[in-house]
Amino acid sequence: MVDVNRFKSMQITLASPSKVRSWSYGEVKKPETINYRTLKPEREGLFDEVIFGPTKDWECACGKYKRIRYKGIVCDRCGVEVTRAKVRRERMGHIELKAPVSHIWYFKGIPSRMGLTLDMSPRALEEVIYFAAYVVIDPKDTPLEPKSLLTEREYREKLQEYGHGSFVAKMGAEAIQDLLKRVDLAAEIAELKEELKSASGQKRIKAVRRLDVLDAFNKSGNKPEWMVLNILPVIPPDLRPMVQLDGGRFAASDLNDLYRRVINRNNRLARLLELNAPGIIVQNEKRMLQEAVDALIDNGRRGRPITGPGSRPLKSLSHMLKGKQGRFRQNLLGKRVDFSGRSVIAVGPTLKMYQCGVPREMAIELFKPFVMREIVAKEYAGNVKAAKRMVERGDERIWDILEEVIKEHPVLLNRAPTLHRLGIQAFEPVLIDGKALRLHPLVCEAYNADFDGDQMAIHVPLSEEAQAEARLLMLAAEHILNPKDGKPVVTPSQDMVLGNYYLTMEDAGREGEGMIFKDKDEAVMAYRNGYAHLHSRVGIAVDSMPNKPWKDNQRHKIMVTTVGKILFNDIMPEDLPYLQEPNNANLTEGTPDKYFLEPGQDIQEVIDGLDINVPFKKKNLGNIIAETFKRFRTTETSAFLDRLKDLGYYHSTLAGLTVGIADIPVIDNKAEIIDAAHHRVEEINKAFRRGLMTDDDRYVAVTTTWREAKEALEKRLIETQDPKNPIVMMMDSGARGNISNFSQLAGMRGLMAAPNGRIMELPILSNFREGLSVLEMFFSTHGARKGMTDTALKTADSGYLTRRLVDVAQDVIIREDDCGTDRGLLIRAITDGKEVTETLEERLQGRYTRKSVKHPETGEVLIGADQLITEDMARKIVDAGVEEVTIRSVFTCATRHGVCRHCYGINLATGDAVEVGEAVGTIAAQSIGEPGTQLTMRTFHTGGVASNTDITQGLPRIQEIFEARNPKGEAVITEVKGNVVEIEEDASTRTKKVYVQGKTGMGEYVVPFTARMKVEVGDEVNRGAALTEGSIQPKRLLEVRDTLSVETYLLAEVQKVYRSQGVEIGDKHVEVMVRQMLRKVRVMDPGDTDLLPGTLMDISDFTDANKDIVISGGIPATSRPVLMGITKASLETNSFLSAASFQETTRVLTDAAIRGKKDHLLGLKENVIIGKIIPAGTGMARYRNIEPQAMNEIEVIDHTEVSAEAVFTAEAE
């Protein structure tokens, strides 16, 4: 076997007949498979042991030679080589075809490669190949045109006219093969290059296409006649198996049927040729053979597919590769693995952050080999077999051994769908009783798991390296931050939030208020014995907490706090300030002075002078975690999170908060608000009936009225709410529910959506406490049903988007430290009209500067060039009033096949500079795809007014951007830079004309009458600026402006969609994706290079080709940038393996074979496919020193010779 990890590259070419013969171990002559009585393969059949190898290890067919000692012997009786049965997966056979047959991929694909090579139309080819017409091969001295078609009748007439043998014309694949042999590649290419100089329009396009194919043949060394087969390879029998079912029947692969048809027809043709049968019969047989081979290679590509029993189309060789069930996606990109299991998950509140509970019976099965090894080592059993029996019997001693084995042996837990890399994390197993896996509650958010019946899979990393990687890189305690935005992903939720909220509440006049305690223990004792309440404000000696970072004026004093806050601060990391108020000032700058007693001051006096603080909510806990992470990194943070979790659970249990119907308040003035709304609606309808407004206006006014009524109820609800109400506490703390849930319980349900997505005018006036009427209930079902279907559709759409994103960016890896580029990206805050989508501070964090940043007023240098901008630095730059900064960006990175560390910045998942080898492309794809399900599906209608202002939003808009489609509601853009001098309206054509005066001339733009204008007369506009509202078409922008403008525009557009839905994504992720869409250029004029006009190629390859020419003093080629959608960009990748496993498998492989493409295995997918370690992370060459180095070689210091006698005498003495 070839060692896969030593592969340099992989090439695919057309197979020549001699190549096929060299693969083959013998010819398959009979269509038989297995003898149904003896169940032995038939001789010379499709499963023949002589050709393909023995069916049993080390045993020939007749049984003369058995055992491994005869290895390599060929049996003299049955002719079978004694070897492993595994060779039946590797050895191929062949069929000698009695007539040439065309390969359907090259004849039928689009464009038809055969047609382009011969300059014949696919229709003409089809007529010749399927024996409907003759083609003139050599006209000799007759006036016939070469390659012209003749019908049967014309052929006979011409023969009579010019005499037999006066010209050569044939039909069938044989004729095509003769024509292909006659193609003189060099001459044709030279001729086409000449033609290109003058041709234009359709003619030019056709010439470029032909030149492309002929050039591919010329460069790759493939011969065009190999597109016609004279010999057909037969794939190994174990790849098209035949298995016996229970009833004695056989289940066989469809390929066997297809091969059988080919062999039958081939043998019949051979017989007919022997018998010198009439031409028409032979022709018909040849045509049938052609169709049989077509069906074998790609069934259904031409004509109706050949069907098996139950009219099911048979699966041909092409179908074996295509689609989700094909070889690529089913068996190569993802495989089922051993040492795995799955079970339902349950909550494990007592686990540490890095632990998971594994049921005993699951663990013993997963770790069986390890346990068996230990049993033998401890000599409880003599050999492995006995050890295995011991485990299977369930001997008492195995449990202790299991405990030892799993210590420090991490396992991986995965929950489907794995939307981002946090969907697989490593834990240390803890043995538990029961049958459910136990999961730590804080990692649920990363997995998006809950305990309503979710299942998870568990995997065991086997090798030492795999265990080390799981422990160091994948341990759950390490994944505090979300890779998409760098915010903590392990924030407490639900009960934990509620417990800490209740704990940190304050209340005036509760029992024990004003007591003073010497330390925490005394305060807790008072609380436990009922002398002080959790919420009562008490004093504590500051000196009892010496490790806290007190200011000097605060030491040795008494501080006012609550018993709950003493407990809350007790679990905080020691260097964090004592938290009194849920705000950032207290967290970063220290405890405010107002809580400390001056000497001799009365504590009650201080308490009365203080406001009651609001408790700590979910958001505040998130900020505390982020700050903890910033200061102390992962280990301390995960320990702190466990303490926070335990405290939260403990106190939410103690608080005993419950919800009953009485907890839902009644709004006193609900009737008044609703009556007023009814009255207003009546007025609007009256105005409409009088003709004072249009129906659209009336609809908008009515819906607005009801919306305002609902908001008025909501406002009243908030004003009158009791902070001690359990529902209010849940909502306010962020544990569960929000104001809109609350207002549906206590206010009114409000307006509902109709099935068509339009808002209905009749609102639901009741709330859930009062209960809905039958009609109201019916109205509310429309929206609910639409919500369910939308979610289902959205999930599939979002998953497919993620797949395309991963595919286009999978080979983007951090490849070097610094690419040394001199370009940068000028960034400012992203705004949408007046609203800021993303602030400059957010955009600067974690990036490197390109130029130094100076204070706009004082001119002092805030930060030098090529420096990392930290969170504090970003704040400092923005506070100084800087509005734009030039940073290093993925857009301008000069690294080939990836990005450099400086252009990327920090790794958001760790908060440190990114490492070389990080697969940033895949992470970017996951970060953009994972929130896809949260985006809405709908297209917004602006209040039913003119439809051309409809804006696509949510998921469809993201797809529109990444696929570079023409947007709906497209904006008109200007091509000239200058001033808007006039906007004139033309009522007759219902359009407006916008005139822009530039330096070189006047631009005139026609805009629809209903479009909303973005510019006014006198405005200064830049090239590519939008004149009307709407989305700009990116391809058009690329023509008018440059690549960087398009990249910046696309980045801003993606961010607008996500931010509007409250999803934060780091800019760099979008940058990685957009850069992949613009990595190709199209050659316009080849100059002196040997590039072909119209070719799509990578920018780096193009610059290389030009570099050589410029050095030698020639004319360089010119090109223009191309914007490709992600699907197209994936298929245009340089790796044919990656493209073939994505979509359009046969087309990609056909093209790659003709070009003799080499896959240099740079990306992740192609390496996974061939089973090589991926070139990212620890798999990068720089981290894997494959050549063994003797680490502790014996050092020879001095070479001394000693005689034997000398030694013995020395010992004797």
UniProtKB/Swiss-Prot annotation:
Disulfide-bond pairs as recorded: none
Cellular component GO terms, alphabetical: DNA-directed RNA polymerase complex
Binding residues for Zn(2+) 2: 819, 893, 900, 903
Residue positions binding Zn(2+) 1: 60, 62, 75, 78
The record's free-text note on cofactor binding: Binds 1 Mg(2+) ion per subunit. Binds 2 Zn(2+) ions per subunit.
Cofactor: Mg(2+); Zn(2+)
Protein name per Swiss-Prot or TrEMBL: DNA-directed RNA polymerase subunit beta'
Species, as recorded: Streptococcus pyogenes serotype M2 (strain MGAS10270)
Gene: rpoC
